[in-house]
Amino acid sequence: MKERIVNLETLDFETSQEVSLRPNLWEDFIGQEKIKSNLQISICAAKKRQESLDHMLFFGPPGLGKTSISHIIAKEMETNIKITAAPMIEKSGDLAAILTNLQAKDILFIDEIHRLSPAIEEVLYPAMEDFRLDIIIGSGPAAQTIKIDLPPFTLIGATTRAGMLSNPLRDRFGMSFRMQFYSPSELSLIIKKAAVKLNQDIKEESADEIAKRSRGTPRIALRLLKRVRDFALVKNSSLMDLNITLHALNELGVNELGFDEADLAYLSLLANAQGRPVGLNTIAASMREDEGTIEDVIEPFLLANGYLERTAKGRIATPKTHALLKIPTLNPQTLF
């Protein structure tokens, strides 16, 4: 399947651009108000006690600001943040090298933390609980355990699949936050702030239109903003007005609901099943996508907005989906 403009994963070329648009202060971070409020209290209390923050877990679909909010936490705590991802920690020595280089109150951010191997988790447990590394030297009867004290640090775990975390690991996080999709008004404000940083003039209605099609996700909103800016430049316009915005979004294949070709193919597959549950493996084979992409990228927004139901037997289209696609729902008695 071709690259999706509404793909939730970070594209390689976007990394430096995303950093330049990332909010640096709480007042710059739009949305997630309840999470921000709780974090501000925890940070204030930790600073007054002169302690590190409790370990915390952020979970939810990609692109909602887990990394950005972690950078703000580090800045508010006046400490350093080390960013890594679970697939990069292959051996216990990899984790030991990271942990022993942390300073007191530093933050270690591990993305995709659900992908840590059980062996790595075993090394992480005493580090999280007692700020201690237990390193085994040698093997067999001659094996020895060396204990290395670590400075107090904060582990921030980020995951799109909280259900795949082992219970022992999940229980060691003192705080757990579910990142929510953003409202169109929040996304519109994010888009307008980003346009200022990009030195791009944008009309209010253009920002609103991009926000409406951004699937509740800032990462997608910023990606669409930059693509619409390209269309404006080609048309020799210094202003992103509604006409240019609508033309660009339509050319990009993103409809008024933020759906693209993959979303519509997914929903059509369910709707045409006429109430029969469709298994994830069947969907993946039909769409030529891996199951993880369907669960983490395609389904969350559709599920949150009532376009499908997940059951033990599979996925079922809702009446909302049938109405959208104009596919009538057959009487169940006619199916047999």
From Swiss-Prot:
Keywords, alphabetical: ATP-binding, Cytoplasm, DNA damage, DNA recombination, DNA repair, DNA-binding, Hydrolase, Nucleotide-binding
Organism: Helicobacter pylori (strain P12)
Subcellular location: Cytoplasm
A GO term for molecular function: four-way junction DNA binding
HAMAP family: DNA_HJ_migration_RuvB
Role according to the record: The RuvA-RuvB-RuvC complex processes Holliday junction (HJ) DNA during genetic recombination and DNA repair, while the RuvA-RuvB complex plays an important role in the rescue of blocked DNA replication forks via replication fork reversal (RFR). RuvA specifically binds to HJ cruciform DNA, conferring on it an open structure. The RuvB hexamer acts as an ATP-dependent pump, pulling dsDNA into and through the RuvAB complex. RuvB forms 2 homohexamers on either side of HJ DNA bound by 1 or 2 RuvA tetramers; 4 subunits per hexamer contact DNA at a time.
GO CC, any one term: cytoplasm
Chain intervals for the UniProt region annotation (Head domain (RuvB-H)): 256-336
Quaternary structure note: Homohexamer. Forms an RuvA(8)-RuvB(12)-Holliday junction (HJ) complex. HJ DNA is sandwiched between 2 RuvA tetramers; dsDNA enters through RuvA and exits via RuvB. An RuvB hexamer assembles on each DNA strand where it exits the tetramer. Each RuvB hexamer is contacted by two RuvA subunits (via domain III) on 2 adjacent RuvB subunits; this complex drives branch migration. In the full resolvosome a probable DNA-RuvA(4)-RuvB(12)-RuvC(2) complex forms which resolves the HJ.
Protein name: Holliday junction branch migration complex subunit RuvB
Residues annotated as binding Mg(2+): T67
Gene behind this protein: ruvB
Tree of life domain: Bacteria
